[in-house]
Regions:
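Conserved strand-to-helix beginnings and helix N-cap segments that scaffold or border functional pockets
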Residues: 67-71, 108, 142-143
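Surface-exposed helix-capping loop/turn segments at secondary-structure junctions
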Residues: 83-93, 158
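Active-site-proximal substrate-binding core of FAD-dependent oxidoreductases
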Residues: 94-102, 157-158
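A conserved FAD-binding loop/helix module that cradles the flavin
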Residues: 128-157
Length: 158
């Protein structure tokens, strides 16, 4: 009964630097939700003289967006990116698509009852820890997820 929103990631390799002038930006009314400029996190994320953009597209598993070809996803996104004057298609060196079926928890009515049932079942297992966004059915930030990971490692070490 626990449901997740899926994620399609479009990675765009470009020679253009400072596309966003920030680490990431959220968008509405676009085929994507967020664009992250990886070089603004660290210049070591890309080869010299290249920049990597991560374009995030949330969808439902096997829906119309999920089932688009890699080329169709790219064309749909680059059209909006060009319209916003962030990047020209001619600036793109290459692109790669990755699909993840279960990323963002969907908090439907009574989800907590279903989650409790799952956790009771998992608690019967020894040496099994359900962690991370998917394992805890929790939409937390990366620092929170890292903390949960460290806490779990401490439990295992004891």
């Amino acid at each position: 009964e626990l449901k997740y929103l899926s994620l399609v990631l479009l990675y765009i390799i470009t020679k253009k630097e400072d596309v966003l002038n920030c680490q990431y930006c959220y968008f509405i009314d676009r085929p994507y939700n967020r664009i992250s400029e990886m070089n603004n996190f660290s210049r070591e994320t890309s080869p010299k003289n290249e920049n990597l953009l991560s374009v995030e597209i949330s969808c439902h598993y096997k829906d119309g967006t999920w089932n688009l070809s890699d080329q169709e996803i790219y064309e749909r996104c680059i059209k909006s990116i060009e319209k916003d004057e962030l990047l020209k298609k001619s600036d793109v060196v290459n692109f790669k698509i990755l699909r993840f079926p279960s990323v963002y928890p969907i908090y439907k009515k009574n989800y907590d009852d279903n989650l409790e049932e799952v956790n009771k079942f998992l608690d019967k297992s020894k040496n099994f820890y359900s962690i991370g966004r998917q394992g805890q059915f929790y939409y937390g930030d990366i620092d929170q997820m890292a903390r949960f990971g460290f806490d779990t490692a401490d439990k295992i070490a004891k």
